[in-house]
Every structure is written in structure tokens, then in C-alpha cells.
């Protein structure tokens, strides 16, 4: 069977939910027995989002092979339950860098290097390579931004050319737009969608399907009007209504036969998607019996997208405990020794996620100290793990000026230090310890119990600093347990205090491996402990 290519574009406004639509379609096609992969095209000129501010971009999602990517890849993995790779996120910066590198090597044999064909050919190669490396039946490619953006033009031209390259029966274009509702007029307005499609058609792409984002149900008259003016079949105008839970969306799209229309267009003769297990999960999610309050003490809490995988992993762990997770967003900059009890006193659990830089770290340390001394379940992630060690050094080992060398290079007690292979690294981008690495678990520890007593787990990392092993014996003598280490025993991966209900922190990012139907072990154990604390109130 020829590989099938589905392209998802957006119009009218950005952040319209293209990624969720693409991920939902991927889940439906996977449940039809097709092997699906998915990728995101980001038209910005950065090589990757690794050095971008979370306020600009949100979370950086890390793949198994160490690519720093767009947060939409997290949605893709969670919805479709697949592990993506470096070919799943392509930026303008990455493409231009590769083309210019080839030009410097003389690989274009003296030709004038141009957007067409050199940039568009490089983009098409990324699409085909993503499908080829995963041996997929279907590849879904989402283009970031909106039609009409200057940055998107080479990407859309590459998508247009794909139809001629692989054949019309193997390509489908899906356009996602906003259908605004004017309260004063009491009606929905189709004109923005019409203009968006007109713009897309002006670039040579005729959409085969429209997905309409809306707050209000769309009547058949509106669908017929859009079908007429945008030249698509009325049944191919799909409503994407706002929902209470994201995981309802695949079921809503299936109810409108979206996946069947896609299969018919691409001439895919495959069974109907069996969504029984997914439906049962959604039913459970919408009828959770308990509630638990988790304080998330972070640096970027004004933008929840900066912690989107953390939030989803907490929710998944809540599902496993039949509990709705309510998140209290605590700005780490506000936390002091004087107000920590007031800010965190109502929390059933405290999570301290990753981050970079000095700002907010002292507040996080106060939150960690409160969790340790008051025996509140606590989970530290990445920088949260490093600060857990710093807090213990300061307040238990009484090393008053202990710190991380990242935060204070002159500290007399560098509990956290630069990794040896990072000493001579000058570039910030793409140089962290990235991707999947193993952690050997200590028998009888809470970490081992969280992972069903496995000897080794593999999780994704994104860091440059590590625990300084010169202090390991001193920590262990005071009851601090290093419950996860690298197989060569050089790198500390997980730490815990066994006397507490749940006081565990890890260097890696467990949230990147969580799925709604298969929650991550440490998160599940953390929420279990938080639910128990909640029941004691």
C-alpha cells in the first residue's frame, strides 16, 4: 500500500486546536489498524524551541532520541500512544541550516540556491523520511501558524507539490478554522473561514475537509453554506465544539464520520475504529469520585502551557486513583519562609517541576522544606530534584551556603555541579543531556515500588547539571536515599526520604512518558499518596 499523506493547516487565528484535531484523527486511524506517525512543521527561524522562553513557546517536549520539540508532540504521543523522533518536528531554522550546510559543501554543484526547489525539496524530504523511518501507512503533518503568514509560504508550497509527487489519491488537505459567534447579532459568521480558504486556494491548495472550531453547535445550514463557498462536500465540514475534556474530541469526530471520510478519500479499505476502550476511559474521566488538590510551585505559572505535560501526567495519575486533580498554581517568586504555610497549607501534595535560572529557586526551596518537614507528599522534577538536594544540604546537613553551581558558581558547597562532558560546551542550544537514558532502581525503595519493582526504567532527560557525588556519603549518612542511579553508578537519577509518606524527586522528566490510559509510575504513586492525605483531612 502506498503511504498516505494528510496535511492539517489552520486559518483565521493561531492556537485554534490544529494539534488536537491532528492527534485525534491519528488515534482514530490507529484504531482502524493503520500504522500512523505524525509531525509538526513550525515556521519560526529558531533551530528548535530549546532556547526559547517558555513565555514565548510553552513547554519544550523531548523525544526518545533527544530532540527538543514543540509541545504539540506531547499531544500527539498522548493521544495516539506512539513515541516520536527527531523527524517529527521541523522548523524553518532547521531546514535553512541544512540547505546552507549543503551549499557550503558544494552539494548543489554551483546552482543558485532558492526557496523553490531547494527549501521545498528539503521540506518534502522531511515528510517522506518521517514516514519511511517509521514504516507508517499514514503520516499526518500539521503546519503551525495560520495561512497567510509570510513564514508559512515555503511550507505550504511544499504541501502543494506533494500532491503531484505522490498522487491525488495519496494526499488529503484538512483546514481548521474558527467560526466566531457574534452574541450581539446572535449568529455565526462564516466570512473569516471563506477568506481563509480563499487564501489557501490562492496558494494552490484546495482543502478536502474543513474542521470548524466553535463554541456553539453548528447547524446544517451553516455547514451547507461553508461547503458551497469553500468547495468541499457538506459531510466534510466537521464541527469541533468546545468540550469539558480533551479526550472527548476523538469520539466527537468519529461521530461525524471524520475518519471514514478520510479513509474514503485516501481509498483505505480498513475496519471501523474500535473506540470501546477509549470511550470507557472518557466515561471514567467524566465521573471521577474523589478530588485532590496539588500545589504546583513553578516559575512560569502565568502560562500553564509551560507545564502542559506535567498537568496532563497529574490528570492521568488522578484517573488511576479515581480522583480529579485540582491544581493550585503557586508562583515560586512569591513563596517565602513567612508565607509558605499559608500558600501551601491546603495542598494534598506539592510538585516542583523543572526550570532554568536563579529566579524563583529560593521559593521552590522553601516549598520543598515545607513538604519535608510537614510530611506533605512531594514530587520534584529535574531542577526540582536538584533543589531537593540543596534544601536537604542546607537544613539537615547544615551546610548553610549550599547551592547549585548553576545558581551560584562561587558556592563553597556545590551540591549540584556541571556534568563533566558539559565543561567545554559553549553553545546553549541542543547541548544538554537529552533523550532516553536508563535508571537503575534501589530494591525496596519507594521509586522501585512506583515502577512495579523493575530493576531498570528508561525515561527522558533534559539537563546540564547533576548531583555532586563528593557529597553522596554525607547525604546517605543522614538518611537521604539515592534510589535511582545510572547503570555505571555515576549519575544520580532519583532521590527520596523513606520516612516521609512520599518525598521523591527525579532528575529526568517522567511526565513525558505518561499516557491517559497508562499513567507514569512516579506520578501515580505521588497522587496515590496525595489522595491518602486528602482522606485524612
Swiss-Prot record:
Pathway: Pyrimidine metabolism; CTP biosynthesis via de novo pathway; CTP from UDP: step 2/2. Mg(2+) binds at residues 72, 142. One of its GO terms (molecular function) is identical protein binding. Residues 1-268 are annotated as: Amidoligase domain. The active site is at 382 (nucleophile), 509, 511. CTP binds at residues 14, 149-151, 189-194, 225. Keywords: ATP-binding, Glutamine amidotransferase, Ligase, Magnesium, Metal-binding, Nucleotide-binding, Pyrimidine biosynthesis. GO terms for cellular component: cytosol. HAMAP family: PyrG. CTPSs have evolved a hybrid strategy for distinguishing between UTP and CTP. The overlapping regions of the product feedback inhibitory and substrate sites recognize a common feature in both compounds, the triphosphate moiety. To differentiate isosteric substrate and product pyrimidine rings, an additional pocket far from the expected kinase/ligase catalytic site, specifically recognizes the cytosine and ribose portions of the product inhibitor. This is CTP synthase. The lineage of its organism: Bacteria, Bacillati, Bacillota, Bacilli, Lactobacillales. The gene is pyrG.
Amino acid at each position: 500500500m502506498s503511504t498516505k499523506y494528510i496535511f492539517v493547516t489552520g486559518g483565521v487565528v493561531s492556537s485554534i486546536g490544529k494539534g488536537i484535531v491532528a492527534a485525534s484523527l491519528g488515534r482514530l486511524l490507529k484504531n482502524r489498524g493503520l500504522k500512523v506517525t505524525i509531525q509538526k512543521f513550525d515556521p519560526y527561524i529558531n533551530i528548535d524551541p530549546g532556547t526559547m522562553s517558555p513565555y514565548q513557546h510553552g513547554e519544550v517536549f523531548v523525544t526518545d532520541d533527544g530532540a527538543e520539540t514543540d509541545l504539540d508532540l506531547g499531544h500527539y504521543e498522548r493521544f495516539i500512544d506512539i513515541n516520536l523522533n527527531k523527524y517529527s518536528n521541523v522548523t524553518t531554522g532547521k531546514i535553512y541550516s541544512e540547505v546552507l550546510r549543503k551549499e557550503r559543501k558544494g552539494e548543489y554543484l554551483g546552482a543558485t540556491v532558492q526557496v523553490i526547489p531547494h527549501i521545498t525539496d528539503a521540506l518534502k524530504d522531511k515528510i517522506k523520511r518521517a514516514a519511511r523511518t517509521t514504516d507508517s501507512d499514514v503520516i499526518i503533518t500539521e503546519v503551525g501558524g495560520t495561512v497567510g503568514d509570510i513564514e508559512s509560504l515555503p511550507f505550504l508550497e511544499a504541501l502543494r507539490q506533494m500532491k503531484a509527487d505522490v498522487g491525488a489519491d495519496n494526499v488529503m488537505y484538512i483546514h481548521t478554522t474558527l467560526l466566531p459567534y457574534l452574541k450581539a447579532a446572535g449568529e455565526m459568521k462564516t466570512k473569516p473561514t471563506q477568506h481563509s480558504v480563499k487564501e489557501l486556494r490562492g496558494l494552490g491548495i484546495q482543502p478536502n475537509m474543513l474542521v470548524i472550531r466553535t463554541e456553539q453547535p453548528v447547524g446544517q445550514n451553516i455547514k451547507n453554506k461553508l461547503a458551497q463557498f469553500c468547495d468541499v462536500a457538506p459531510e466534510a465540514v466537521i464541527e469541533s465544539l468546545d468540550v469539558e475534556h480533551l479526550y472527548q474530541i476523538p469520539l466527537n469526530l468519529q461521530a461525524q464520520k471524520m475518519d471514514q471520510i478520510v479513509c474514503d478519500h485516501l481509498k483505505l479499505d480498513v475496519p471501523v475504529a474500535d473506540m470501546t476502550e477509549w470511550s470507557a476511559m472518557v466515561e471514567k474521566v467524566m465521573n471521577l469520585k474523589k478530588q485532590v488538590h496539588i500545589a504546583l510551585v513553578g516559575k512560569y505559572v502565568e502560562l500553564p502551557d509551560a507545564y502542559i505535560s506535567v498537568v496532563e501526567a497529574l490528570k492521568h495519575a488522578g484517573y488511576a486513583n479515581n480522583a480529579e486533580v485540582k491544581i493550585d498554581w503557586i508562583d515560586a517568586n512569591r513563596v517565602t519562609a513567612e508565607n509558605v504555610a499559608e500558600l501551601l497549607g491546603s495542598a494534598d501534595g506539592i510538585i516542583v517541576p523543572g526550570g532554568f535560572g536563579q529566579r524563583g529557586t529560593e521559593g521552590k526551596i522553601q516549598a520543598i522544606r515545607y513538604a519535608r518537614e510537614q510530611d506533605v507528599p512531594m514530587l520534584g522534577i529535574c531542577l526540582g530534584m536538584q533543589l531537593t538536594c540543596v534544601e536537604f544540604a542546607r537544613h539537615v546537613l547544615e551546610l548553610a551556603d549550599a547551592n547549585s553551581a548553576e545558581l551560584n558558581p562561587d558556592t563553597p558547597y556545590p551540591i549540584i555541579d556541571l556534568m563533566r562532558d558539559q565543561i567545554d560546551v559553549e553553545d546553549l542550544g541542543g547541548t544538554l543531556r537529552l533523550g532516553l537514558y536508563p535508571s537503575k532502581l534501589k530494591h525496596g525503595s519507594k521509586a522501585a515500588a512506583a515502577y512495579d519493582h523493575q530493576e531498570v526504567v528508561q525515561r527522558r532527560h533534559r539537563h546540564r547539571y547533576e548531583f555532586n557525588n563528593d557529597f553522596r556519603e554525607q547525604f546517605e549518612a543522614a538518611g537521604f536515599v539515592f534510589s535511582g542511579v545510572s547503570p555505571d553508578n555515576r549519575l544520580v537519577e532519583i532521590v527520596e526520604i523513606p520516612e516521609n509518606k512520599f518525598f521523591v524527586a527525579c532528575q529526568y522528566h517522567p511526565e513525558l512518558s505518561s499516557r491517559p490510559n497508562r499513567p507514569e509510575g512516579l506520578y501515580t504513586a505521588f497522587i496515590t499518596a496525595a489522595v491518602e492525605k486528602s482522606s485524612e483531612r
